[in-house]
């Protein structure tokens, strides 16, 4: 998925910790082979290159993910659009589980979804092994916290200023929940753009969202980067959100 993952697992001996870590790595490799649109061997890459010519069948898991993304599209009033152009140009056949693009230029991009999905998969692995204290940091933008820090009642997560890495612009406490931070980084300014206008919101540098569900947190942090203030409140009302912060810097 083009980034690193750090895991802090507490309360487990070396044997169990290594076993859990190997399962986590295997799961990330598996998900990358399905969801990474840049990997020529991934399922999503195949869909993007075939669906413009003819209906393309997808696996059961990817089909469920795409159906989930359609629900997020509706719940965010169209601001979460994985088509990168016009979601109405993507046809889904519910009987055959196929995807077809009715216009050129359509590419499915799960960049605002995949890390949240991966964190929820990792959560299942941790829970299956009765791990109750852990901190999973995915690319310094997506975080899963189980239990609390051993010297406190929560995990305190600092939000860095991407334009001044030594500066912390905020802190969010996590306990059995997740955090997603989206932003216009110096190297990726404007990579999150409004599907209705094709423009990015220059006034919003960082958005951080904490929520019980990692996918919800990632989708909402992504959409709040581009939604106006009226839609911002409407979108947030559609989800169970613990806290969200918008930084203009």
What is each stretch, according to the model?
Residues 1-249:
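Mature catalytic core of soluble alpha/beta enzymes
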């Amino acid at each position: 998925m083009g980034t690193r993952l750090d895991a802090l697992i507490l309360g487990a001996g070396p044997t169990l910790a290594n076993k859990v870590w190997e399962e986590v790595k295997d799961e990330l490799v598996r998900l990358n082979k399905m969801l990474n649109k840049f990997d020529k061997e991934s399922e999503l890459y195949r869909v993007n290159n075939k669906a413009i010519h003819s209906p393309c069948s997808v696996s059961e898991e990817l089909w469920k993910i795409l159906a989930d993304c359609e629900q997020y599209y509706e719940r965010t009033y169209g601001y979460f659009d994985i088509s990168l152009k016009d979601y109405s140009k993507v046809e889904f056949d519910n009987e055959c589980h196929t995807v077809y693009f009715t216009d050129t230029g359509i590419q499915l991009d799960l960049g605002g979804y995949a890390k949240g999905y991966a964190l929820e998969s990792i959560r299942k692995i941790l829970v299956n092994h009765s791990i109750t204290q852990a901190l999973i940091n995915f690319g310094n933008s997506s975080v899963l916290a189980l239990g609390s820090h051993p010297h406190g009642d929560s995990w305190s997560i600092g939000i860095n200023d991407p334009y001044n890495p030594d500066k912390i612009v905020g802190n969010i406490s996590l306990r059995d929940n997740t955090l997603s931070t989206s932003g216009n980084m110096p190297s990726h300014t404007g990579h999150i753009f409004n599907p209705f206008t094709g423009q990015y919101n220059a006034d919003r540098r960082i958005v951080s969202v904490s929520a019980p569900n990692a996918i919800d947190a990632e989708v909402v942090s992504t959409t709040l980067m581009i939604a106006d203030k009226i839609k911002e409140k409407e979108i947030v009302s559609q989800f169970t959100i613990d806290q969200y912060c918008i930084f203009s810097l």
